[in-house]
């Protein structure tokens, strides 16, 4: 091929990021999300994929049509990180409980968990397809064996390899039945790290024998089941390569994944804009090293033009043989052919609306109901003189589940509990400086009984800051003063397990792995009584 053809071919292997919204002014993360002008320019030059975030399901549907129109063809890989259903990222679609919810259910009812995991995958695939996506960046195949993991946490299907692998495989079956591509991630395993690779480069110091027993087992299982793609992890695994992170390591991607595991599908990098990579090499060299190591697709290069230039130069110099380019292009064509055929078979059954069907709505409720946990006494009586619901969220600026009409706010408010929402950029409930056994500054809360609600889970870019907060001491402080009347934990099961044991049997408490309105509604119903109503209205003003 000539230089122009080669550049267009290399461009097909890049996946850039864009907003699901139509307008540039609506971009949530303009640092990473390309403008419409840049998108049109790159798509015209042959960019082969787009990862989308933000907007409604209907907006996403139109956005995907627009992107294909700008590209001038339908052979685009259009994907999203929808590990918890399409509604996790796009409003109006179904947001499902995190995968670890089914991992906990699996220990008590494995048959039910497996059935729900497959339905979970099928729901995700059906909605993704109706919205215009053909590639779901899930399932997570990391085994969350480290409770202190700041970034995987509830995204994993479990903390036991066999259960995590079985549930991820069931989810993948649902994706395949729904006609979209799946992606097992993050190879060779990100579950036993205490660092966030969005911010730094983790090192996984285990023997190969241990890695085979824990980290690698779900990936072997998904590959045997025919998963379409595998995403790399930005971490160093000295048992395989002591120098380079897996994303840039031929020993991991070619020797282990491609040759030893005999994986014939697409290998895609995790986002190359993450600090674990940008802290090592520039945008051009990162793309070259990843491709040289064995990756087929380059996700979110820090600079798409520099990435294309560098890979073309590496091909021209002979650093990377032209056969590698041909192999990656063929794998990409094969993947598109598979999902195009499956999508065609599902086309007739798909309703035109991008939003959720009644069956999908029912699945969301069933998943919340099946995975919630409770303990303790009878529902809380409305406080005669008023009380406080102390709500801790781990990211108020990206908090779609806690609007003024959210059940976690509205239901307690209707019962006489005044909401106080704590977050990193706002009010702090803590004494400054810390006061040991009495960490809460109760003067900031006011008088009355306290209903505690914690919305805490593993999230990227937080570096585990929430783990340092003294919630056990806070609960003991409130108990000593006879002020704690109930507790709800949404998200992290490890936080729930550490706090629930501190409560006497007389205090009702409940847990859901999910944080969405459905989970709030069910937990508030358990704690405050089903006969209560939200009672929203004039209490919320501009």
Question: Predicted regions span which residues?
Answer:
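Second-shell residues forming the walls of enzyme active-site clefts
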Residues: 3, 25-29, 50, 56-76, ...
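Preference for extracellular/luminal or secreted protein segments
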Residues: 1-38, 46, 259, 281-542
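Surface-exposed, active-site-proximal loop segments in enzymatic domains
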Residues: 91-107, 146-157, 196-202
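Alpha-helical scaffold segments that flank or form the walls of functional sites
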Residues: 108-133, 224, 286-292
């Amino acid at each position: 091929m000539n230089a122009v053809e080669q550049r267009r071919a290399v461009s097909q292997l890049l996946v850039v990021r864009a907003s699901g919204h139509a307008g540039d002014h609506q971009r949530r993360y303009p640092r990473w999300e390309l403008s419409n002008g840049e998108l049109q320019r790159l798509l015209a030059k042959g960019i082969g994929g787009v990862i989308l975030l933000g907007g409604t399901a209907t907006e996403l549907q139109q956005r995907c049509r627009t992107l294909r129109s700008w590209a001038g063809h339908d052979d685009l890989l259009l994907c999203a990180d929808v590990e918890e259903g399409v509604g996790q990222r796009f409003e109006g679609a179904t947001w499902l409980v995190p995968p670890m919810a089914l991992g906990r259910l699996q220990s008590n009812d494995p048959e039910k968990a497996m059935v729900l995991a497959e339905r979970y995958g099928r729901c995700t695939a059906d909605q993704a397809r109706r919205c215009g996506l053909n590639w779901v960046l899930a399932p997570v195949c990391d085994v969350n064996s480290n409770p202190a993991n700041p970034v995987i946490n509830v995204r994993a299907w479990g903390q036991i390899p066999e259960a995590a692998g079985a549930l991820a495989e069931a989810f993948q079956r649902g994706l395949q039945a729904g006609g979209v591509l799946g992606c097992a991630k993050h190879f060779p395993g990100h579950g036993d790290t205490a660092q966030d690779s969005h911010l730094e480069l983790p090192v996984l110091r285990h023997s190969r024998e241990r890695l085979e027993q824990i980290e690698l087992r779900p990936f072997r299982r998904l590959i045997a089941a025919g998963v379409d793609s595998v995403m790399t992890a930005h971490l160093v695994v000295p048992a395989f390569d002591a120098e380079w992170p897996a994303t840039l390591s031929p020993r991991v991607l070619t020797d282990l994944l491609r040759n030893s595991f005999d994986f014939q599908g697409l290998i895609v990098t995790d986002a190359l804009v993450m600090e674990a990579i940008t802290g090592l090499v520039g945008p051009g060299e990162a793309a070259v090293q990843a491709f040289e190591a064995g990756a087929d697709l380059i996700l979110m290069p820090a600079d798409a033009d520099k990435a294309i230039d560098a890979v073309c130069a590496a091909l021209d110099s002979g650093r990377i043989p032209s056969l590698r380019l041909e192999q990656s292009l063929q794998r990409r064509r094969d993947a598109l052919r598979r999902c195009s055929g499956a999508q065609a078979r599902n086309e007739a059954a798909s309703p035109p609306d991008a939003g959720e069907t009644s069956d999908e709505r029912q699945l969301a409720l069933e998943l919340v109901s099946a995975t919630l946990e409770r303990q303790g006494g009878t529902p809380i009586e409305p406080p005669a003189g008023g009380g406080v619901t102390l709500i801790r969220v781990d990211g108020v600026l990206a908090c779609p589940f806690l609007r003024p009409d959210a059940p976690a706010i509205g239901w307690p408010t209707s019962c006489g509990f005044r909401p106080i929402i704590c977050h990193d950029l706002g009010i702090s409930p803590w004494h400054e400086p810390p006061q040991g056994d009495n960490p809460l500054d109760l003067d900031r809360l006011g008088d009355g009984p306290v209903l505690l609600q914690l919305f805490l889970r593993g999230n990227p870019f937080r570096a585990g800051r929430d783990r340092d907060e003294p919630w056990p001491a806070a609960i003991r402080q409130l108990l000593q003063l006879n002020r704690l009347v109930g507790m709800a934990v949404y998200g992290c099961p490890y936080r729930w397990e550490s706090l629930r044991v501190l409560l006497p049997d007389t205090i009702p408490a409940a847990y859901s792995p999910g944080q969405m309105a459905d989970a709030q509604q069910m937990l508030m119903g358990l704690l405050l009584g089903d006969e209560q109503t939200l009672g929203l209205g004039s209490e919320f003003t501009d």
